Design a protein with these regions (language model features):
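Electrostatic, structured charged patches in enzyme active sites and in nucleic-acid/phosphate-binding
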Residues: 1-93
Length: 93
């Protein structure tokens, strides 16, 4: 399952996430403690287009290891996510 998840996330590695959206997603997730792939964007954005864009951005941040999840379980819209504290140093460089 782990390798399936890594392969799934590869397509998001090069996705661009704007600095403002990235900070908004990470700050909100930090405040919440944890959320899911679908819930985080729905919590922030109110219109469907931005929620869908936000879901794509969350996957991109998971692929870039800024957001963490259990990669040994199947990745779904309900996957529990949290801010990757181990990668916080790299974000601040």
């Amino acid at each position: 399952q782990y390798w399936e998840n890594i392969n799934f996330l590869k397509k998001f590695r090069r996705s661009h996430v704007g600095a403002v959206d990235q900070q908004l997603l990470l700050d909100t997730l930090q405040e919440l403690g944890q959320s899911t792939i679908n819930q985080l964007p729905a919590h922030i954005f109110k219109d469907k287009t931005n929620v869908l864009k936000g879901i794509h951005q969350v996957w991109a941040l998971v692929a870039k290891r800024m957001i963490a999840c259990d990669l040994y379980c199947p990745l779904t819209a309900e996957t529990v996510i949290w801010v990757n504290q181990n990668d916080a140093f790299a974000r601040n460089i």
